[in-house]
Amino acid sequence: MAKRMQVILNQKVSKLGENGDVVEVAPGYARNYLIPQGVAVLATKGAIKQAEFRKEKERQRLLAEKQEAETRKTAIEKLSPYSIPKQVGENEAIFGTVTSQDVATVILENAKLEIDRRGITVPDIGQLGVYKVQVKLHPEVSADIEIKVIAQ
């Protein structure tokens, strides 16, 4: 049975692990591919400690991002419903449509928060009325707000 050696991955490697993981691989794979390509480093005690420190720091950063998103969610939902004026034709049908950019702009004007328009899910809006819109602030946090489309 061949000996195995431990390496710390510097980036994600399919079927092996994520950045910062300590994995055991065949010595030839480590010496001939992983280490020369910069994909991994030899797992010494100091390197393992440093990798654990980096992982903990990354975990704390992700937690802080999620808490920031929760704060933004509260601020956005507190001011709901938001009014968007649109030109109206007959039968209360609006000209054009309400886009995610319109929603992002109205949130910026009212809540003073800049939101990425790509994270906003707007239903098809063709009439005046109140509509539910989902604003994704973080992979785990989304705000549900109401948009009131009014005549201009």
Swiss-Prot record:
Transmembrane segments: none annotated. GO terms for molecular function: rRNA binding; structural constituent of ribosome. InterPro entries: Ribosomal_bL9, Ribosomal_bL9/RNase_H1_N, Ribosomal_bL9_bac/chp, Ribosomal_bL9_C, Ribosomal_bL9_C_sf, Ribosomal_bL9_N, Ribosomal_bL9_N_sf. It comes from the Bacteria. Coiled coil: none annotated. GO terms for cellular component: ribonucleoprotein complex; ribosome. Keywords: Ribonucleoprotein, Ribosomal protein, RNA-binding, rRNA-binding. One of its GO terms (biological process) is translation. The keyword Glycosyltransferase does not apply. Belongs to the bacterial ribosomal protein bL9 family. HAMAP family: Ribosomal_bL9. Binds to the 23S rRNA. This is Large ribosomal subunit protein bL9.
